[in-house]
Regions:
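Sensor-1/coupling segment of RecA-like P-loop NTPase cores
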Residues: 1-36
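A short helix-turn-beta junction within AAA+ P-loop NTPase domains corresponding to the substrate/partner-engaging
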Residues: 29-51
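Conserved adenine-nucleotide phosphate-binding loops and their immediately adjacent elements
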Residues: 38-42, 208-214, 229-239
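Winged-helix-like regulatory helical subdomains adjacent to P-loop NTPase cores
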Residues: 46-47, 54-170, 176-177, 206, ...
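Minor-groove-contacting beta-hairpin "wing" of winged helix-turn-helix DNA-binding domains
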Residues: 179-184
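Short, amphipathic alpha-helical interaction segments positioned at domain boundaries
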Residues: 187-217
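Acidic-basic catalytic patches of nuclease active cores, encompassing PD-(D/E)XK
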Residues: 223-259
Length: 260
């Protein structure tokens, strides 16, 4: 439309609002034989609007829904629990509410939210597909997320760091008290599951956990002391000859594989 602006009415200007900075977009608005540089008037302006929902905003949405549908709903409890899982990430907030409404028997309670989250973490959707694709496309981001989750490493929040900048732009990480943290519990769990699933098939510690699983529930309660005891036995048998550095770097990951 821009190239034909002299023969037909068109926009005076175009504003793009989205995830990518305009300086990272490759546009061709002229013939290939002409220069390809962006106009100096293309300005990537900051968009200082926090798109995340607060607990109060989630509560307001639930109140509106409750007024329209006359549900039995523990509004404040649901709003707080949804926020604890999502940190207000809009897609996740809406998705959890949709799952409660359609697949959890309209159980608008803390348990209903928990059930919806379990369904969400098991399903494929465009957001999680994009998460997986992005960490494949950006190995620096993947390495940082892996180190945070499994080695407990901390990274000072520095937007000049490429991995931090790209992770923030996609909404996968955020700044908290000057440090990089995973954006919300659902992303954290999904990433745990993704990284662990790549190791399950050939993991001896995982196979040991599978064999021990039936021993861990007693009278409907998880016997955590027995879990730790059994894990330490298997860990010593399998990895006892490794160095302290190996234990420090891999202990958390191996324990999660055992629990998986």
């Amino acid at each position: 439309k821009f190239l034909k602006r002299n023969t037909r009415p068109t926009f005076h200007s175009v504003i793009l609002a989205g995830v990518y900075d305009i300086k990272n977009l490759k546009h061709r608005i002229r013939e290939d034989r002409e220069h390809q540089m962006n106009s100096p008037w293309n300005i990537a302006a900051d968009f200082p609007v926090d798109m995340s929902f607060t607990v109060e905003e989630i509560e307001g949405m639930l109140n509106e829904y409750n007024d329209e549908h006359s549900c039995v709903m523990l509004v404040r409890e649901c709003a707080k629990t949804i926020f604890e899982y999502t940190s207000g990430y809009p897609y996740l907030v809406s998705k959890i509410c949709k799952l409660i409404d359609e697949r959890c028997g309209e159980n608008w309670t803390k348990q209903g939210v928990s059930d919806a989250v379990k369904i969400l973490l098991r399903e494929a959707n465009p957001l999680f597909d994009d998460l997986r694709k992005k960490i494949t496309d950006y190995p620096e981001l993947r390495a940082m997320l892996y180190a945070i989750l499994f080695r407990g490493e901390s990274y000072p929040y520095n937007p000049d760091n490429f991995a931090i900048d790209i992770g923030t732009m996609f909404g996968f990480i955020k700044e908290k008290n000057g440090q990089v943290v995973i954006a919300n519990r659902i992303f954290e769990t999904r990433l745990y599951n993704l990284f662990l699933s790549e190791e399950l098939t050939n993991s001896i510690i995982y196979q040991s956990g599978e064999r021990d699983k039936n021993q861990f529930i007693k009278n409907g309660v998880l016997d955590m002391e027995l879990v730790l005891e059994k894990f330490m036995i298997h860990f010593h048998d399998i990895y006892g000859d490794n160095t302290n550095t190996f234990v420090e770097e891999n202990g958390r990951r191996l324990f999660l594989l055992y629990l998986k």
